[in-house]
Amino acid sequence: MKTTCFLISLILIQGTKNLPILEIASNNQPQNVDSVCSGTLQKTEDVHLMGFTLSGQKVADSPLEASKRWAFRTGVPPKNVEYTEGEEAKTCYNISVTDPSGKSLLLDPPTNIRDYPKCKTIHHIQGQNPHAQGIALHLWGAFFLYDRIASTTMYRGKVFTEGNIAAMIVNKTVHKMIFSRQGQGYRHMNLTSTNKYWTSSNGTQTNDTGCFGALQEYNSTKNQTCAPSKIPPPLPTARPEIKLTSTPTDATKLNTTDPSSDDEDLATSGSGSGEREPHTTSDAVTKQGLSSTMPPTPSPQPSTPQQGGNNTNHSQDAVTELDKNNTTAQPSMPPHNTTTISTNNTSKHNFSTLSAPLQNTTNDNTQSTITENEQTSAPSITTLPPTGNPTTAKSTSSKKGPATTAPNTTNEHFTSPPPTPSSTAQHLVYFRRKRSILWREGDMFPFLDGLINAPIDFDPVPNTKTIFDESSSSGASAEEDQHASPNISLTLSYFPNINENTAYSGENENDCDAELRIWSVQEDDLAAGLSWIPFFGPGIEGLYTAVLIKNQNNLVCRLRRLANQTAKSLELLLRVTTEERTFSLINRHAIDFLLTRWGGTCKVLGPDCCIGIEDLSKNISEQIDQIKKDEQKEGTGWGLGGKWWTSDWGVLTNLGILLLLSIAVLIALSCICRIFTKYIG
């Protein structure tokens, strides 16, 4: 009763208290964010979600390295932490991000999303606008599962429901550089797409734009998008920022990584971008009010040599001309629209989304440049120098080497989408890469967005079917479909047929599970501590028991397989030794024949020739047969051996005796009651 009252009061407290997503404080000076990056990392294909349990404890070999991310408490920055096999996702949050006026900053979900992200522990969080300054949630590599679709965008009105997990992973390149600051701005990685997260209208500000998940300053009146500079432009009002409770670290130390060492990791970045993009002399995002479900893309810091081939440096003179043509034409776009932001490298395409096409504000020269770049399978880069720092650079083409960047600039790449016909229908999410990815039975899909451009080392197993094959949007242009790769295909492994012989015979290599689930002391204590929780406790105990039974079956299967393998090995050795004995005897007879004129082999060699090769094949065969009999012997007897009171039959006998005694006691009590009733009454 006390436990029930405690749980009810706890639920009421959680329901009435809104936990802020972060603390907002008015301050004109930006702060460094204390990033905690630690823990062993796992192979992405081995990271699965099984119910409430993370499985997979293998040392990661480059480039697929990941660490888990869950929701974050007030004042605590996102952390990369170590997770072990069997660890549970205990803390997930409903997320509602709003601006100071209370307007939601999240995008509307695509029409094909039917299910919501789910967590075991539910808390409702509301926060103010995190986009102007500071970071609320880290979007690079943060994946929210919507009905088999792993998206990097949280959608408006989609809530967490108890029962599943919202899983998030990043690679080591991202979590080393996510909060880094240095010199003129934040260090960014050279990935393949850059995009704004939300676009909204706020009074006189025609196009308030911010970057979700990026530490940045922006001038809302000038519509800068994710372009931090050394001296942030002033905002009309006090700028909010994160008020941290942890001690800030020297972020410049996080920047001392060798860019070349991260080349392999770029193939599996959290944003799902796997290709290297040609860098430019000075890159900034275009002023076209774009919005996408992809996270903000970092770029390398200034004067950093980049790895890659066939890089093309675009002229900035054309960029300046484009700036003049576009400064007066700012398209208006609802905050929920999304657009394709993809990079058509030589043979790779990015995961992207389509929505209602934008208004075409570029001139004919820009469109022709886009068409030419698409025909040469190179991304069309449209750059714009930051406000107040117009710079020009020399135009070079088809040149390898480090990019020369102007001061106060940040490399952020945008690939302009090809012109699309006018349409008001919102298109569905689709994928630009075809992958056959195995979804093992009992597991949730391991983070589609992070593996979309990553190499898949395993092939689909037989007896599988396609469960998700999203076709490209019907509104996509012909040029875009021409460059698009086949669509992604997920496969789901069937459960074994119950009619098949699935016993742990150990006769084949695949009969037994190669892994044993060893529970740690902490997990034992956790299971014991959670066993009292209603509904969840029995599940924990059932999981624990199921794992123990599975371990026992695996051990039995392994022993049988060991016996079978030992018997087979002995049979092979017996055959080899028998053949060698036969060949030795034949050779000895041949030698005796050749040495007959000299009195035979023993006459020549003396006593050393008296060596007999004993035939022990019969004994070995008997031992092999005994191993097979022991391996096939089942413990189905009544246990009559040993002490009778401890054997199976003895236990049954004891139970029978207790039952008879109980009946006798009941009869005696009944008789006593009657006697008392007769004489006393």
From Swiss-Prot:
Gene3D superfamilies in the cross-refs: 1.10.287.210
UniProt entry tagged with the keyword Signal: yes
Region of interest (Fusion peptide), residue spans: 529-549
InterPro entries, sorted: Ebola-like_HR1-HR2, GPC_FiloV, GPC_filovir-type_extra_dom, TLV/ENV_coat_polyprotein
Glycan-modified residues: 94, 171, 190, 202, 207, 219, 223, 255, 310, 313, 325-326, 337, 344-345, 350, 360, 408, 487, 564, 619
One Gene Ontology cellular component annotation held by this UniProt entry: virion membrane
CDD domains registered for this protein in UniProt: Ebola-like_HR1-HR2
Residues covered by region (Disordered): 223-427
Residues marked Cleavage (site): R435, S436
Effect recorded for R435L: Complete loss of cleavage between GP1 and GP2
Skewed-composition ranges (Low complexity): 337-347
Residues annotated as transmembrane: 649-669
Cystine residue pairs: C37-C610, C92-C119, C211-C226, C512-C557, C602-C609
Keyword Chaperone annotated: no
Topological domain ranges for the Cytoplasmic compartment: 670-681
Signal peptide coordinates: 1-18
Region annotation Receptor-binding: where it falls in the sequence: 38-188
Function: GP1 is responsible for binding to the receptor(s) on target cells. Interacts with CD209/DC-SIGN and CLEC4M/DC-SIGNR which act as cofactors for virus entry into the host cell. Binding to CD209 and CLEC4M, which are respectively found on dendritic cells (DCs), and on endothelial cells of liver sinusoids and lymph node sinuses, facilitate infection of macrophages and endothelial cells. These interactions not only facilitate virus cell entry, but also allow capture of viral particles by DCs and subsequent transmission to susceptible cells without DCs infection (trans infection).
PANTHER family: VIRAL ENVELOPE PROTEIN
Record text about domains: The coiled coil regions play a role in oligomerization and fusion activity.
The protein's name: Envelope glycoprotein
Lineage: Viruses, Riboviria, Orthornavirae, Negarnaviricota, Haploviricotina
